[in-house]
Amino acid sequence: LDRFHQLAEARAEDDVEELTSRLIVTDVHDFEEQAEAVRDTSEFAERADLVVLDSVTGFYRLERVGDGDHGESLRRVARQVTHLLSLARKHDLAVVVTNQVFTDPDSDRARPLGGHTLTHWSGAVVRIERFRGGNRRATLEKHQAKPAGDSARFKIVGDGLESVEDSP
C-alpha cells in the first residue's frame, strides 16, 4: 500500500484516504489461503472494476517441490484463473494476473512458470523485462485483437511510469 499511497498523492485528484477505502487487499501466506481469496472475489466482483492476483504461481512454485503430482498443483492454479476469468466475463471486470518465470536449462531462455496453461487462459500476455538503470520493456506476446511484438520502454518513477528511449 505504500506504493499506492505514493502514486495516489502524486497523481490523484481524489482524496487518498477515500481512494484507499475503495481497495480490498488480501495478504495470503500459502496456496490454500490464495485459493480462498480467489473464491472470495465472487462476493465483491459485481462492485469491482479490477482484480489483481500477484503472483498466481508464487505458491505453486513452493507446492510443486513437495508435490509428487506436479499436475495437481497446476490444476489448482488453472481453477483459480478460470474462476477469475468467469467473474471477469460475468461482471465486465478487468483481471490482471502476474506470473513468475524460470530459465529453461535446455534453451537458456526465460519461460513462464506453469508452462502454457496460463498463456492459454489469458486474453493478453505482456512480458516485462528489466535492464540496467531501472529501465524496463513491456512486450505484447498475446492479444485477441492486436499483433504480438509491439513494445514500449519505460522507467518506474515516483509518480508513476516514464517513457524512455529505445536503448536498454
Task: For the regions a language model picked out, list residue spans one by one.
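Amphipathic alpha-helical transducer elements in NTP-driven molecular machines
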Residues: E17, F31, A35-V38, G71-T82, ...
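Small-side-chain structural scaffolding
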Residues: A37, T41, A48, S55-T57, ...
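Phosphate-binding/switch region of NTP-binding enzymes
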Residues: S86-P168
